A protein has these predicted regions:
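HotDog/MaoC-like acyl-thioester-processing domains
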Residues: 6-8, 71-72, 83-139
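Hot-dog-fold acyl-thioester-processing enzymes
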Residues: 2-59, 115-139
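A generic signature of intrinsically disordered, low-complexity regions enriched in glycine/proline
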Residues: 20-22, 67, 101
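Hydrophobic beta-strand-centered segment that forms part of the acyl-chain substrate-binding groove
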Residues: 39-77, 81-89, 103, 111
């Protein structure tokens, strides 16, 4: 449906690594969140806009495959690929070093819930879908 890709650059900070000097596995999720926030900012419908529209987008599924370690002070990028945005908001994350070597691959699935009732929606809100479609069409 979508398959739009955007790339965001980062550096592995000292507080991200363990005593062996490699990034602790839990911190990959934090970087995915930062990349997802940048992606949503580009779309023009970020988490603050979702709050104003009275819905949230919790993650209901996350999977990851760690291929090669990230080390302290290593520069890397995350390629975010939009996979679906009808019932689920699905993204694929590919962590790459600056030479293009794959370091990690992950996927998240998110569903919309109404903030007041916490009720799960069967589809993503129309305004969010419209923003995503406009973003895809413009790229």
């Amino acid at each position: 449906m979508a398959n739009l890709k955007r790339t965001y650059h980062f550096i592995a900070e000292f507080f991200d690594v363990d005593s062996m000097g490699v990034m602790w596995h839990g911190n990959y999720v934090r970087y995915m969140e930062m990349a997802r926030c940048r992606f949503l900012d580009e779309v023009g419908f970020n988490y603050l806009a979702m709050k104003e529209a009275r819905f949230a987008l919790p993650i209901v599924k996350l999977d990851s495959k760690f291929i090669a370690p990230l080390e302290f002070n290593q520069r890397f990028c995350i390629e975010v690929e939009l996979l679906e945005f009808e019932c689920f908001f699905r993204l694929k994350y590919t962590f790459l070093d600056l030479d293009g070597k794959k370091l990690c691959q992950a996927h998240t699935s998110q569903v919309a819930i109404l903030l007041e009732s916490k009720e799960t929606c069967f589809y993503l809100p129309n305004d969010f879908i419209k923003a995503l479609k406009a973003f895809v069409d413009s790229h």
